[in-house]
Amino acid sequence: MGRRPARCYRQIKGKPYPKSRYCRGVPDPKIRIYDVGMKRKGVDEFPFCVHLVSWEKENVSSEALEAARIACNKYMVKSAGKDAFHLRIRVHPFHVLRINKMLSCAGADRLQTGMRGAFGKALGTCARVAIGQVLLSVRCKDNHGVHAQEALRRAKFKFPGRQKIIVSRKWGFTKFNRAEYTKLRAMKRIVPDGVNAKFLSNHGPLANRQPGSAFISATSE
């Protein structure tokens, strides 16, 4: 018996049903890699960021997420190069899908109980997505922004429903606008922290210290 089509599970119904000690025997999700490309590049390297945003409330299967990741990664490697981007999958397939297998042969009513005890067994996993939720994000240099948008456009065909490609006003994966990030970086109020950035606050007794040394202990001064 083949895999049931994902259109049967597209609508969100009922409560979330995650894997637990009560829900056993769940197949592993098809997607196992959520960060692709130069994921160790610093926050200053890739200022451009673009998102693929869901425009419907629906379930997205792990197979669709893996297909979108492969399509986006393949185009970016071919057009921009494998060292020129960082792709991140922003949703995780934690919701377990169930199936109540039914026989369709002659005399099936003698072998099964029909809809009695029809809770079903685990079939696969999916991600429950809301309207406006980000599915995929790509950060890169400004000159590869066109390639990133085209890569997400190709990945969009792997998902059901409607999605939008939105160019972010933020600097990379951070929460700071580009102009704000540049200004705070020049003032040394922002410290790079991997793919993100840490803001050095000026509240409290630390306000009298020099910018960039807010977390230095008093013993080292």
Swiss-Prot record:
Top-level taxon of origin: Eukaryota
Keyword flag Ribonucleoprotein: yes
Record bears the keyword DNA repair: no
PANTHER family: 60S RIBOSOMAL PROTEIN L10
Protein name: Large ribosomal subunit protein uL16x
UniProt-listed SUPFAM superfamilies: Ribosomal protein L16p/L10e
Subunit structure: Component of the small ribosomal subunit. Mature ribosomes consist of a small (40S) and a large (60S) subunit. The 40S subunit contains about 33 different proteins and 1 molecule of RNA (18S). The 60S subunit contains about 49 different proteins and 3 molecules of RNA (25S, 5.8S and 5S).
UniProt-listed GO biological process terms: developmental process; response to UV-B; translation
One Gene Ontology molecular-function label: mRNA binding
